[in-house]
């Protein structure tokens, strides 16, 4: 799969928004300005009138053009006919808006509540004291009559994926489900056409701050942590196509005295040769991109064990390098990674005492509680995700449906299967915050510039997003009252910290 990584030139802050809130400016209501950043980075380079990020995905799709939906002009969220229809609908909505709840909205709310009750009853019928497989079967038949993956309201589409997950558990397939074999990811194993996966990734970038929030927070912290270093070594747990690092390279290259950057990506032998080949191709493209910037750069990979655990002995270290561990976990576009694999990576970080450890993770409920309790928490979480996408792009139904089908649907099915298989606890865990503290890591404070950057990012999206500072070292992305994902900063750089 060819990819022109030359086209990733910025952090995708173009100074405008296609969404519903006010565009960000030099002085917005967050009290942040693009012109007031740490001198470590030339942020002006990231706020020009560039829109090259999309060329990356476009070029990847062009090289894999097999003709599925969204393949001809990816990120085009609708066809010309749909745009005309949407323009008409928008006009009608504008002229008929009232402050009262319409009968249609009331009906949707009633149906949504009914679906929630049916889903909860279905979950209860599959486990616990009230387990009744025949009742579960009847409930699922009724749910299938009421929902659709492609039509209807947000709640109806969401319920369709949860119904699919419950059906898999009832039939026994879900209990043995392994999301790494079904989750549709860029550059990874999947059952969707590659063009659909690439298109969905670009659309997810356009529709929400989920991916950018983690990348930008981690990158800003890294730049600050290595400001005066001559050599930097980043160990990346799940590099995918390397999109995160192109923007960091540009930040480092903007400093005349910037450091040499080395990235070690982990490859997974358990997935076969494809994983290693993908990592090597990512390294080739990142190397070419660094050369185009004049950024000193080298790339290596380290293979995980067959059980996906990490052994630090396989890591090549050079004296004088500032070591950074980067860990992106279970975001919508990423493959699920087991807690044992993640723990082995973080344990290695503890042994090697890096300058900084960045952890970006999905915010889920506690790993405690039974299946029904965690089922409802998952329903609440994904309801917030679906709502946030619709609020940002209310008219682009086909685009949202693609993101839901490629990323969110498989994530729902896989997550519920793991919860069910472990009886509600165990493998599917909550935040890594307590684990890191118990292991001896200490938090690294999030800088005011980093927090300000997050607020500016959210200014490009719908007003329902907000960022919360949790403690001094963690930023949490919210949709309204629901936590979606977080970015936290850690270190274990001294013997006393890691004892």
Curated annotation (Swiss-Prot):
A motif (VHIID) lies at residues 232-236. The keyword Metal-binding does not apply. One of its GO terms (biological process) is nodulation. It is found in: Nucleus membrane; Endoplasmic reticulum. Keywords: Endoplasmic reticulum, Membrane, Nodulation, Nucleus, Transcription, Transcription regulation. Disruption phenotype: Roots of knockout plants form very few aborted and non-functional nodules under nitrogen limitation when inoculated with Mesorhizobium loti. Residues 281-313 are annotated as: Leucine repeat II (LRII). Induction: Induced in roots after inoculation with Mesorhizobium loti. Down-regulated in developmentally young regions of roots after inoculation with Mesorhizobium loti. Residues 88-104 have a biased composition (Low complexity). Residues 106-491 form the GRAS domain. Residues 64-106 are annotated as: Disordered. Residues 323-414 are annotated as: PFYRE. Residues 417-491 are annotated as: SAW. It comes from the Eukaryota. Residues 201-265 are annotated as: VHIID. GO terms for cellular component: endoplasmic reticulum; nuclear membrane; nucleus. Its main location: nucleus. Residues 113-182 are annotated as: Leucine repeat I (LRI). The keyword Transcription regulation applies. Interacts with IPN2. Binds to RAD1. Interacts with RAM1. Belongs to the GRAS family. Transcriptional regulator essential for Nod-factor-induced gene expression. Acts downstream of calcium spiking and a calcium/calmodulin-dependent protein kinase required for activation of early nodulation gene expression. Transcription factor involved in the induction of NIN and ENOD40 genes, which are required for rhizobial infection and early nodule development. Does not seem to contribute to the early steps of the arbuscular mycorrhizal fungus infection and colonization processes in roots. This is Protein NODULATION SIGNALING PATHWAY 2.
């Amino acid at each position: 799969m060819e990819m022109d990584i030359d086209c990733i030139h910025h952090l995708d802050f173009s100074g405008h928004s296609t969404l519903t809130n006010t565009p960000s400016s030099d002085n917005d209501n967050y009290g942040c300005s693009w012109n007031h950043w740490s001198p470590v980075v030339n942020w002006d380079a990231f706020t020009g009138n560039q829109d090259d990020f999309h060329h990356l995905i476009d070029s990847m799709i062009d090289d894999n053009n097999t003709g599925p939906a969204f393949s001809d002009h990816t990120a085009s969220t609708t066809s010309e006919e749909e745009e005309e229809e949407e323009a008409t609908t928008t006009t009608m909505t504008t002229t008929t808006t009232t402050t009262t709840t319409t009968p249609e909205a009331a009906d949707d709310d009633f149906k949504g509540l009914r679906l929630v009750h049916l889903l909860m009853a279905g979950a209860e019928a599959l486990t616990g004291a009230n387990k009744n497989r025949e009742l579960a079967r009847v409930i699922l038949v009724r749910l299938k009559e009421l929902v659709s993956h492609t039509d209807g309201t947000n709640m109806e589409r969401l319920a369709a994926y949860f119904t699919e997950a419950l059906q898999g558990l009832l039939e026994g397939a879900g209990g043995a489900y392994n999301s790494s074999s079904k989750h549709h990811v860029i550059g990874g194993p999947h059952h969707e056409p590659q063009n659909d996966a690439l298109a969905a990734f670009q659309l997810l970038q356009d529709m929400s701050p989920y991916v950018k929030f983690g990348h930008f927070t981690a990158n800003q912290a890294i730049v600050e942590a290595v400001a005066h270093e001559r050599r930097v070594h980043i160990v990346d747990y799940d590099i995918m196509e390397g999109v995160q690092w192109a923007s960091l390279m540009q930040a480092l290259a903007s400093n005349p005295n910037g450091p040499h950057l080395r990235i070690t990506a982990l490859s997974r032998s358990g997935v076969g040769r494809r994983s290693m080949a993908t990592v090597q191709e990512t390294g080739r493209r990142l190397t070419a991109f660094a050369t185009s910037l004049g950024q000193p750069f080298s790339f290596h990979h380290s293979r995980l064990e067959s059980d996906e655990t990490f052994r630090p002995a396989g890591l090549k270290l050079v004296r004088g390098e500032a070591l950074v561990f980067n860990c992106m976990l279970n975001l919508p576009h990423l493959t699920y990674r087991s807690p044992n694999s993640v723990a082995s990576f973080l344990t290695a970080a503890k042994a090697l005492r890096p300058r900084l450890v960045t952890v970006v993770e999905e915010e889920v409920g506690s790993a405690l509680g039974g299946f029904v309790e965690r089922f409802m928490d998952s329903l609440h979480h994904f309801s917030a995700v679906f709502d946030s996408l619709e609020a940002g792009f209310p008219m682009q139904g086909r685009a949202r449906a693609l993101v839901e089908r490629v990323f969110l649907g498989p994530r729902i099915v896989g997550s519920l299967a793991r919860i069910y298989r472990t009886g509600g606890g165990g493998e599917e865990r909550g935040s890594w915050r307590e684990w890191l503290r118990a292991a001896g890591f200490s938090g690294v404070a999030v800088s005011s510039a980093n927090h300000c950057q997050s607020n500016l990012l959210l200014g490009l999206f719908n007003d329902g997003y907000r960022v919360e500072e949790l403690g001094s070292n963690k930023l949490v992305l919210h949709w309204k009252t629901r936590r979606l994902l977080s970015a936290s900063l850690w270190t274990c750089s001294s013997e006393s910290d890691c004892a």
